[in-house]
């Protein structure tokens, strides 16, 4: 259910109107399929969690190995990682454009995510990428960056 937000907030009643405004901009209305899937996941327990975690860890470890030597922020969990494009004298948006144009790699610049210095970071999501598609991504990234410096 990557990207689908299902949950609740427990807070003092005085904070709820402000939280509702924040959630409106940060959380997409839950799709019916997500609500159904969340209900089933809650009832089924944690049986598949270890298997899913192992798959995501394998993808993470492969992409980290592929991008070795680049300014990557190693994730402790989740299904994405950040590259510090600023240390390569680029913005995240510039690096995103170069990777898309020269290597057919789609990655998200972090300038709109509200983090401090977000414009210097680029996000790679590997959640649903099969290992076969991740293999070789390091060479593709390096070639695209080299083209950008020519």
Residue ranges and their predicted role:
Residues 1-150:
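PLP-dependent class I/II
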């Amino acid at each position: 259910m990557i990207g689908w937000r299902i949950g609740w907030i427990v807070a003092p009643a005085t904070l709820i109107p402000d939280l509702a405004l924040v959630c409106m901009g940060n959380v997409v209305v839950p799709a019916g399929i997500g609500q159904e899937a969340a209900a089933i996941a809650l009832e089924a327990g944690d049986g598949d969690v270890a298997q899913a975690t192992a798959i995501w860890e394998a993808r993470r470890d492969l992409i980290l190995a592929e991008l070795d030597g680049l300014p990557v922020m190693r994730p402790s969990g989740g299904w994405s990682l950040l590259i510090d494009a600023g240390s390569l004298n680029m913005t995240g948006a510039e690096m995103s454009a170069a990777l898309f144009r020269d290597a057919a790699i789609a990655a998200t610049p972090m300038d709109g995510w509200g983090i401090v210095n977000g414009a210097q970071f680029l996000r790679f999501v590997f959640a649903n990428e099969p290992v076969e598609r991740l293999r070789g991504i390091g060479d593709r990234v390096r070639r695209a960056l080299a083209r950008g410096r020519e």
